[in-house]
A protein has these predicted regions:
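Residue-level detector of conserved, function-critical positions
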Residues: 1-180
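Short acidic, Gly/Ser-rich segments with clustered Asp/Glu that frequently serve as metal-coordination loops
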Residues: 190-198, 203
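Short glycine-aspartate micro-motif
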Residues: 185-187
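Metal-dependent phosphoesterase signature
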Residues: 247-268
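Short linear loop/turn motifs
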Residues: 78, 128-132, 260-263, 360-370
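Short, surface-exposed loop/turn motifs at beta-strand boundaries within globular domains
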Residues: 181-183, 210
Length: 382
């Protein structure tokens, strides 16, 4: 099996080895020889990698369990590929399988394609500089079955999931139009700098909505289950986290400055996720969506926001759980029309599982609790 690429492979890369992630210096499971005349790579020996957790080669990591047919050592000439307007084309032997390894690049805007040997496209995707940032230094690609990360410099990560619309082929080579993800769902929870001035105002009223402090996501679909989990604290940029809010979620302004991720990178990722998700799920999820959308517009501008092209189905576990918890509504104004109040996340969780969940008001803990509640509520409704 050969892997052919353009002549923009790094000329100093003569040989690569693949090993388990935790054992970089031993137990090699595959060797790749760079063949300059063929402008690509020839796989010299190839053991089965599907059971290997987190294989890695020379600082270029593969995350998760990756099927052996998509272990591909991409090593690009960054300046020529990512800074040009060319479309890099990757041909992977005679591979026409249904699984396509995702690839993440950085450029002003660049369209990539993966083709089979008959020049039929298996996948294509576009990344833009606004969404994922830009750097020519210390790039490290993480190539996985469902998503990819970039390490821009040191340990500063930006996250992106290249949701691919692709023209695939079945085992007999017949084309199948569609997407590798079916019914993509995004579970989301946020922690913020405070509360909105008016809950009823739209997210476009930016002064009304608080800033994002922490956001956690669980992304899944019908075909593959959970595709990604992300837990991100944002580095404050032009605002600060009030002590009153920090007392609730435990993230002080100094901590966010120290450990937070670049705001633009996180926002670019969130915009990609929202623009590709079919369903968005959470507890009091309208609040989370308004906060995230307002932040996307602050960073990118509404004219560049990708999520505006998507009409999501929104599912709120708070509303789903109201008639399960049946907590009396003591509000004089709404009691007659709504005898039960909306449950807090922990109230719903306790009702469903007869226990409290830990680390409340941590976005990752909250989104996991909402995820568990959603599927338990679905089970009870069957």
């Amino acid at each position: 099996m050969s892997i052919l690429c353009w002549d923009n492979m790094r000329p100093d890369c003569k040989r690569w080895k693949v090993s388990p992630y935790e054992e970089r210096n031993c137990n090699w499971v595959a060797v790749f020889d760079f063949d300059k005349e063929k402008e690509g790579i020839v796989i010299e020996e190839h053991d089965k990698l599907s059971e290997t957790e987190n294989p890695s080669y020379g600082g270029y990591d593969i995350v998760g369990k990756v099927p052996e047919e998509i272990i591909i050592p991409f090593k690009w000439d960054y300046a020529r590929v990512f800074y040009s307007e060319q479309n890099p084309i990757i041909v992977v032997g005679n591979y026409t399988g249904k699984k396509v390894g995702n690839f993440l690049g950085a450029a002003n805007e660049i369209k990539c394609a993966i083709l089979d040997t008959n020049q039929r496209p298996l996948s294509s995707f576009i990344f833009d500089r606004v969404s994922i940032g830009w750097s020519c230094q210390d790039l490290r690609f993480h190539i996985g079955n469902y998503g990819a990360d970039i390490n821009l410099a040191k340990d500063e990560f930006i996250y992106a999931v290249p949701f691919l619309n692709y023209d695939s082929c079945d085992e007999e080579g017949h084309r199948i139009w569609g997407t590798p993800f079916k019914n993509l769902r995004c579970f989301i929870d946020t922690e913020t700098t405070g509360l909105p001035i008016n809950d009823n105002l739209p997210y476009t009223e930016l002064d009304n909505w608080p800033h994002l402090v922490q956001v956690a996501l669980i992304i899944e679909d019908d075909n593959y289950g959970i595709l990604a989990k992300r837990n991100m604290i944002l580095k404050p940029d032009g605002y600060s986290i009030p002590e009153s809010s920090a007392r609730i979620h435990g993230i002080a302004n100094a901590q966010a400055i120290k450990v937070g991720e670049d705001r633009k990178h996180v926002i670019g990722f969130l915009d990609q996720v929202l623009s590709n998700s079919n369903i968005v799920i959470g507890h009091n999820v309208s609040f989370d969506l308004n906060v995230v959308k307002a932040e996307i517009i602050r960073v990118k501008g509404i004219e560049n926001a990708l999520f505006t092209t998507k009409n999501h189905n929104v599912v709120d576990t708070m509303k789903m759980g109201m008639n399960i918890c049946k907590i009396p509504n003591l509000s004089f104004h709404t009691h007659m029309s709504q005898p039960y109040k909306y449950p807090k996340l922990d109230e719903l969780y306790y009702k469903l599982f007869n226990k409290h969940f830990n680390n409340q008001h941590d976005a990752m803990a909250d989104v996991q609790a909402a995820y568990d509640c959603y599927y338990e509520l679905k089970r009870k409704s069957q």
